[in-house]
Amino acid sequence: MKKTLIAGVLFALCSQGAMAANDWRFAAGADVWNAKGSGQVYGASTNYDDHYNWNGYLQLEHGIIFLPNAKFEISDFSTSGGAFKNELTASDLNLYYRLFNNDLFKIDLGLTGRYYDGELTSYGRKGYDKDTVMAYAGSELYIPNTGFAFFGDLRTHDVDNYDYRLGASYKFSNMPVKLRAGWREANVDFDNVDQRIDGWFTGGEFTF
């Protein structure tokens, strides 16, 4: 009886391990963002130009119930115009749980640790940085049997510090590639930095 129980437990653990292994997903993606800024940095402002920014990410999802999924992302929030140039990047570590996942939609909730690293050039140079923690939510709504989906995600610390995306995507049925496009808006407000960056983006994702 004892041997049977041990064998049953081992079989259950192996089955769960195999299920978790099948649920593992690793993805890499990047976007190009036609963004424009507004606001000021250390009291300096300008007539902002359109700016081609970028972001890239690595994402790991799995079937282990109690461990969060993870996504590391770097986004370029730089803005410029005339003698004004604000080079700003945001590095994010998103840890989240998938609350719902079915053939029609998925919903994620978690936290984001964000690190800002910037340098202002405006008749001189001024470096600055900032750490913050933000609430994270993401969702995707699928159109069955088409490969198309609508998606959105939000990171927010308060009403003056947020970053959201809304868009649509298409996943090819015969290759692990997804194309996407949409709108992104980020508002950054800390210390002597008060800027908003928004615009249309397009990009893709490759799943391993």
Can you name each region flagged by the protein language model?
Residues 19-79:
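Short glycine/proline- and aromatic-enriched beta-strand/turn motifs that initiate or cap beta-hairpins
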Residues 30-32, 70-78, 109-114, 147-159, ...:
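Transmembrane beta-strand segments that form the barrel wall of outer-membrane beta-barrel proteins
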Residues 64-148:
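Gram-negative (and chloroplast) outer-membrane scaffold detector with strong preference
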Residues 48-49, 80-87, 103, 129-133, ...:
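Solvent-exposed loop/turn segments connecting transmembrane beta-strands
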Residues 4, 22-26, 54, 66-68, ...:
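Outer-envelope beta-barrel architecture signal
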Residues 111-123, 175-208:
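Outer-membrane beta-barrel translocator/channel fold
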Residues 30, 56-62, 93-97, 111-113, ...:
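Residues on the lipid-exposed face of transmembrane beta-strands in outer-membrane beta-barrel proteins
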